[in-house]
Amino acid sequence: MNNKGSGLTPAQALDKLDALYEQSVVALRNAIGKYITSGELPDENARKQGLFVYPSLTVTWDGSTTNPPKTRAFGRFTHAGSYTTTITRPTLFRSYLNEQLTLLYQDYGAHISVQPSQHEIPYPYVIDGSELTLDRSMSAGLTRYFPTTELAQIGDETADGIYHPTEFSPLSHFDARRVDFSLARLRHYTGTPVEHFQPFVLFTNYTRYVDEFVRWGCSQILDPDSPYIALSCAGGNWITAETEAPEEAISDLAWKKHQMPAWHLITADGQGITLVNIGVGPSNAKTICDHLAVLRPDVWLMIGHCGGLRESQAIGDYVLAHAYLRDDHVLDAVLPPDIPIPSIAEVQRALYDATKLVSGRPGEEVKQRLRTGTVVTTDDRNWELRYSASALRFNLSRAVAIDMESATIAAQGYRFRVPYGTLLCVSDKSLHGEIKLPGQANRFYAVSYTHLTLPTIA
């Protein structure tokens, strides 16, 4: 049985989402404008009728499809029933939504409907991009008379599987309020528009990797045979083939204003690469993944430096993580550390093949420089000061490297259903007397590998 009935096609649903969302945004901006200029308050009756609400998307399947697809990880139902969520920024997510809805529509004959929801758009999310000018004295009034962000309504219960069942099952991991919250944070932390983020994401904890990414990105933009057309940089720089001295333009200090600056190597079809310098520590790693997950990237990879834990390793060797020892503690409440974080075969293979491709060496020679094993992620930057306890734990786990971000990023990928992987470079060997010293960074960088990860996703 096909239950499409009088429902919408994916294209019709997306158009209606666009129209309803834009209608609410315009109404909210107009009401704010009137309040600023004349003190006029929004009409309470109109608000109750949905003047400022998000649109909602509902997909229903009656369970009658014969032999539904079971192997793919997305675009499928687990049981019959109705699934719903609220939607924000439908234009930004159009390609993603179209892919998902098309699979459900074609393979299951799903019934798709769009209507106004009961959840209002918080006013801070419509200010950006408008011509509205606010000062601090207006903040209290706006918060009193207009919908605002209520943290009690924002959470990851759905993604963490602890939501309370209702008549409708959740259609997405994140509803509109959670998405808007993260989109605002992404712009704040990275210094770039959310529209510029690409689906293939690199995280790093080393500034020099940014330098290499920028250098390589600029060369790609100048190559007429390359699919890359622009480089968006933290701080507002926009680099194209017409930009004079692009690397000099990027070298200003604008990116330093942001906690986790990002650079986006953009393609015309939106299949480019984003690099985020997340700095040091599991807190930053958790934070950026919490927010970036709402964009549903195709993959995120950690490329950074680490401490080598084995005598057989040398500075400049590579570490491909196939397991993680989670001593970061930032996710223990939502993903206990005894839950294993498996490596993803396709990602592991791609990283290994990229290492062979760029090095130009056969597999046996690559294995002399590329160590596969367990990576420890700690929240203690001075773990060396607890040598006895640390050394025992490393031996029990057979760990080969230690850092402060990789396991957190992998755990967040597992938690939010984003493919993940880790390729690190050994920068020091504290357990064997080769500690990190001033000036050693130049030596490490000389044998480093940023260019190895780019063919993996380019």
Q: In which residue ranges do the predicted regions lie?
A:
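N-terminal short beta-loop-beta anion/metal-coordinating cradle
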Residues: 9-277
